[in-house]
A protein has these predicted regions:
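Conserved interaction-surface patches within small, structured recognition/assembly domains
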Residues: 58-61
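C-terminal binding/interaction regions
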Residues: 1-23, 27-28, 46-47, 54-56, ...
Length: 125
């Protein structure tokens, strides 16, 4: 098994930032009707000295395949501490690079669900 697949399995079996936040500033949930994956995210933010908003904490919950759950785990690790506006520019290529493997179009929908949830959540801020 290559290192990328091992990393995906590790994030699936031991997800980072899994659970719920106390008093989140925003919460959003969505699903993938093709495979039944469901991901929700909660965000806590604060205003930085320059006036921009920073993500202080993020948690995700849900259930689904190893790809969707690992993608959510990796994504929450990546964005914690980032300015919210910097998260708006994350794209398909970022998720693909983060996972490190080629995915079929159906599996890519699983991998992109957490990014979709994150971007819709920060749009609510």
């Amino acid at each position: 098994m290559d290192i990328y697949r091992e990393n995906i399995l590790d994030h699936y079996k031991n997800p980072r930032n899994f659970g719920r936040l106390d008093k989140p500033d925003v919460s959003y949930e969505a699903g993938n009707p093709l495979c039944g994956d469901v991901i929700g995210m909660e965000i806590k933010k604060r205003q930085m000295a320059d006036g921009r908003w920073q993500m202080v904490d993020i948690k995700f919950w849900g259930e689904g395949c190893a790809i969707s759950q690992a993608s959510a785990s990796m994504l929450t690790e990546k964005v914690k501490g980032m300015a919210l506006e910097d998260m708006k520019i994350l794209r398909y290529e970022d998720i693909k690079k983060m996972l490190g493997i080629e995915l079929s179009p159906v599996r890519m929908k699983c991998a992109l669900l957490p990014l979709e949830v994150l971007q819709k959540a920060i749009a609510l801020v």
